[in-house]
Amino acid sequence: MDFDLEQQARESLGASSAFPLGEPNTAFAQHFIGNSFLAPLAGGVANVTFEPGCRNNWHVHHGERQVLVCTGGRGWYQEWGQPAQELHAGDVVDIQPEVKHWHGAAKDSWFTHIAIAMPVKGCDEQSNEWLEPVDDEQYGKLA
């Protein structure tokens, strides 16, 4: 990821985010369309920043809930078989275990959220199952 992209993110979200941008999200890049940044904040809590048009693949969290606290920009969240929900700073999404979903930025906006992994009580193993990319045509229809 080049300096220009990082500078764009800082300029676009700098005033609206109290959290660090983090580093290029290379560890999970194969599960994303576009570039993202990851800033671990504490055990199971991270700030994730998406460039315009960036989104993660459909995926499922096994053995844990995921809570997204939107902190800047404009993005999308969608559960399999449901319409996409537009997200803005202040929105909170509570994703139950075993729910197939994706989330990411709008086409024309940087987007950032805090992702919180919450293990299910009594469940010893947590994992993410990464699935197919979000269909470009369907994503392109989002306003």
Language-model segments: residues:
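Residue-level recognition of conserved beta-strand positions in structured domain cores
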Residues: 47, 60, 71, 79-81, ...
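Short hydrophobic/aromatic-rich beta-strand segments that constitute the beta-sheet cores
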Residues: 39-40, 77, 113
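A short, N-terminal "cap"/entry segment at the start of jelly-roll beta-barrel domains
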Residues: 1-44, 128-143
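A short hydrophobic beta-strand segment most commonly corresponding to one strand
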Residues: 67, 94, 108-129
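Conserved metal-binding segment of the jelly-roll/cupin
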Residues: 50-53, 87-108, 118
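A short beta-strand-loop-beta hairpin characteristic of the jelly-roll/cupin
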Residues: 55, 62-89, 99
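Conserved short histidine dyad/triad with adjacent acidic residue
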Residues: 46-62
